Structure formats: structure tokens, C-alpha cells
């Protein structure tokens, strides 16, 4: 018998390695780290991505350069001279230290970071002409990317909301872009600065004229993108104005590192989110919370003129409105009045008495059994017939009193 044909094995699709402006091995030490940790790092846009290896597709950390302040060369602790392999990246709220293998690698990292942050090729670094050409190409790519990208300090808020954001989060910046209030295809710039102990809030108008943005000041200035508008305000105020950037250093997708069984490499795995459970039934009874020791007391009656939805306990019957009826005591059994009772028989038949259980025979004898045709529903005791007759007499007396 021929074995069943199996479909051909499809090779597992491999992800595409991310592209970066510049990438190399980089050792990083954050404010809370005790020692340096080695990563494969890549610069793309205004973000540095960190990977466990140069063959990983998913980053494990990232660092936003939106709050960039400056770069400085770092001399290792206990060393009398600069080995040319340490530098520090100072942001608005933290300082990160880096360590590379060579002086050339350090200058390359500093040059590419300054290129994307300041949108210019630095000229005060120890770089070769080929390095400067690479940075000029990155500058053109970054300018094209920002022309199509909305700055991070642009928020869809009103004028009042912009003022409140700058007031509530002063550590996040003091310059914010927002849609124009006149409904035109332009933007407005809101700033908040301290002057003589008083916070001063100012608003600037930016008009849209074709593909360009014109800043409406004494000498109108034309910009090719919104990012250029932000750079104009930052550069013309000697960096006194800082773009507003809320802290968003938290990931939205859960992931973990797992070793690939085929090649042994570490890969980043993002498990699929579990689907939502069944929706609770709105029309059904509400679940009862576990009762405490104080809930064992009988519930109090509801207050008048209050509309509350609550669940009636099982042991409590609904209130009954009685109209021209005798209310029976709770200690006596309540007999419901039927609409029409049949005439009682002249004499109640005596209920048959059930047979006694047959004695067990241990010596092999057989006990006698009743015929099957004589099996009838039996009363448990003979006293139940007397109680039925007594209730019947009471019912006849009540009917006589009513008539």
C-alpha cells in the first residue's frame, strides 16, 4: 500500500533586516546600569535601535534623539588620557554613555547623530572625505523623510489645550505645533517661557502657500516642511525653545526573545493577543458577591420613592396585596381558594396499606411476592388519610360560612 503523499515543505519565511543610516557594535550604559552592555545598534531617523545581534530583526531597546542637547567625549574613570573610545549622549532628562572599539567608530557615531539632529554635516570631527559624503547622503534622506512626516511636537489640540499642556508638563518642552484656529490649511505655534518670574505664552501663525509654509513674523520666513518650521524657532532662539515631546518609552506589543530550533539564533517573538471573552449577558441575573459575616442578617426593606434595581433573594416572596380577603397567619398552612371545587365524594376510600418488606431468607427459601398488577401508589403512613379528612371538614365549614 502506497503511503500518502505529503505536501512539499515550504521554507520558513525570513524577515528582512532593517535598514539604518549607520550601524555597528556599540556598548551602552544607562543611568541605572552598573556596567556597559554590548548591542548591535543602528541609527534610523531620530532613533537609535539596539539589537542582541546583527542578525536580529526586532530591536530590544530604542533611544529617541528628540530631546538631544549635546555630545561629549568621555574619559574612562581612573584613566589619565582619552583613549578615543568613549563618548556621552546628553539628552534633556538623562545621560547615556557609549563605548566603541576605535576612534574612527566614535567619530562616525557622533557625526551621524549630529547630522540627523541638526540637519547639517559636522565639520569639526576627525572624518575622512568618504565619511563626509556618506553623511551628506544621510542628510538628504533625512530631509526627504521629515518633509513627509509630521513633527512629534505637532498635536491636534486647541489653543487653550496647548497652553494647558505646556503648563502641566514643563519638563517635556515649551514649543508646540497645533492646527490653525481659523480653519485654514495652516498651523499655529504656541510657546511658553519664563520672563522676570512670570510665564509668558505667545502664539505664532504659519500660513500654507502651496507646498511651503510661511512663518508670519516681521520678516516672513518660508519653510519646506513643518519640521523646518520647528528648526527655525529652535535655531533663532539659541535653543531656548525646546519642541514639546511627551515621554512614550513604553512598548505596545508584548514580545520576548526565543532561540530558533533550526539555527539556534535568538529571535524576537510577539505572541498573538488572546481574543476577547464572551460578552456578559445583560439580561440575566447579576452575579451575587460572596456574603460576609455581616451579610447574614435579614435585609432591610427598601426606602420609599427610590428606584433601585436589585435581585430579590430566593427565600423572600413578593409582597401580596390583599383586598377583602382573610389573611392567614404565617404559622398556619395557607390554602388557596380554588375557582370551582368538585363535589366531595360521600366517603373517602381508605388508602391501601403498603406491603411490609419481605424478610430475607438465608436458608435458600423463597419469599412470597405480590403480583405485579396489584402495585399502586401508596401513602407513606396511615395518619395522612386522617389529616386529609380533617382538612376536608375545615374546608366545608369555611364554604358554609362564606355562603
Swiss-Prot record:
Residues 382-402 form a coiled coil. The modification Phosphotyrosine is found at residues 22, 250, 310, 322. The gene is STAP2. Residues 18-130 form the PH domain. Residues 343-356 have a biased composition (Pro residues). It comes from the Eukaryota. Residues 133-248 form the SH2 domain. This is Signal-transducing adaptor protein 2. Its main location: cytoplasm. InterPro entries: PH-like_dom_sf (IPR011993), SH2 (IPR000980), SH2_dom_sf (IPR036860), STAP1/STAP2 (IPR039111), STAP2_SH2 (IPR035878). Widely expressed. Substrate of protein kinase PTK6. May play a regulatory role in the acute-phase response in systemic inflammation and may modulate STAT3 activity. PROSITE patterns: SH2 (PS50001). Keywords: Coiled coil, Cytoplasm, Phosphoprotein, SH2 domain. It is found in: Cytoplasm. One of its GO terms (molecular function) is signaling adaptor activity. Interacts with PTK6 and CSF1R. One of its GO terms (cellular component) is cytosol. Phosphorylated on tyrosine. Tyr-250 may be important for interaction with kinases. Phosphorylated by PTK6 at Tyr-250 modulates PTK6-mediated STAT3 activation. Tyr-22 and Tyr-322 appears to be phosphorylated by SRC. Residues 270-308, 331-374 are annotated as: Disordered.
Amino acid at each position: 500500500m502506497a503511503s500518502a503523499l505529503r505536501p512539499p515543505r515550504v521554507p520558513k519565511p525570513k524577515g528582512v533586516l532593517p535598514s539604518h543610516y549607520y550601524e555597528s557594535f556599540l556598548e551602552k550604559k544607562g543611568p541605572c546600569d552598573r556596567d556597559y552592555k554590548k548591542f548591535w545598534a543602528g541609527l534610523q531617523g531620530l532613533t537609535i535601535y539596539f539589537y542582541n545581534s546583527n542578525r536580529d530583526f526586532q530591536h530590544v531597546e530604542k533611544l529617541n534623539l528628540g530631546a538631544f542637547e549635546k555630545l561629549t567625549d568621555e574619559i574612562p574613570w581612573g584613566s589619565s588620557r582619552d583613549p578615543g573610545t568613549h563618548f556621552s549622549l546628553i539628552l534633556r532628562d538623562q545621560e547615556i554613555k557609549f563605548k566603541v572599539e576605535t576612534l574612527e567608530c566614535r567619530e562616525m557615531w557622533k557625526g551621524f547623530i549630529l547630522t540627523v539632529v541638526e540637519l547639517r554635516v559636522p565639520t569639526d570631527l576627525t572624518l575622512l572625505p568618504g565619511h563626509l559624503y556618506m553623511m551628506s547622503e544621510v542628510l538628504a534622506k533625512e530631509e526627504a523623510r521629515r518633509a513627509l512626516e509630521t513633527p512629534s511636537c505637532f498635536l491636534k489640540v486647541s489653543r487653550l489645550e496647548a497652553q494647558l499642556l505646556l503648563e502641566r508638563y514643563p519638563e517635556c518642552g515649551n514649543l508646540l505645533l497645533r492646527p490653525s484656529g481659523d480653519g485654514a490649511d495652516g498651523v499655529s505655534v504656541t510657546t511658553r517661557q519664563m520672563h522676570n518670574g512670570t510665564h509668558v505664552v505667545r502664539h505664532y501663525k504659519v500660513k500654507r502657500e502651496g507646498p511651503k509654509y510661511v512663518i508670519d513674523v516681521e520678516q516672513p520666513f518660508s519653510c519646506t516642511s513643518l519640521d523646518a518650521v520647528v528648526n527655525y524657532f529652535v535655531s533663532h532662539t539659541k535653543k531656548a525653545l525646546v519642541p514639546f515631546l511627551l515621554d512614550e518609552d513604553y512598548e505596545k506589543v508584548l514580545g520576548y526573545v526565543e532561540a530558533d530550533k533550526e539555527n539556534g539564533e535568538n529571535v524576537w517573538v510577539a505572541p498573538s493577543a488572546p481574543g476577547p471573552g464572551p460578552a456578559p449577558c445583560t439580561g440575566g441575573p447579576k452575579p451575587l458577591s460572596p456574603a460576609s459575616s455581616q451579610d447574614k442578617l435579614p435585609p432591610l426593606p427598601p426606602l420609599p420613592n427610590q428606584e433601585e434595581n436589585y435581585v430579590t433573594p430566593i427565600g423572600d416572596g413578593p409582597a401580596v396585596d390583599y383586598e377583602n380577603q382573610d389573611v392567614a397567619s404565617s404559622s398556619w398552612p395557607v390554602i388557596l381558594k380554588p375557582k370551582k371545587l368538585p363535589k366531595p365524594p360521600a366517603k373517602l376510600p381508605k388508602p391501601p396499606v403498603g406491603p411490609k418488606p419481605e424478610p430475607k431468607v438465608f436458608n435458600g427459601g423463597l419469599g412470597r411476592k405480590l403480583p405485579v398488577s396489584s402495585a399502586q401508589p401508596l401513602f407513606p403512613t396511615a395518619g395522612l388519610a386522617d389529616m386529609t379528612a380533617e382538612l376536608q371538614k375545615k374546608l366545608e365549614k369555611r364554604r358554609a360560612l362564606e355562603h
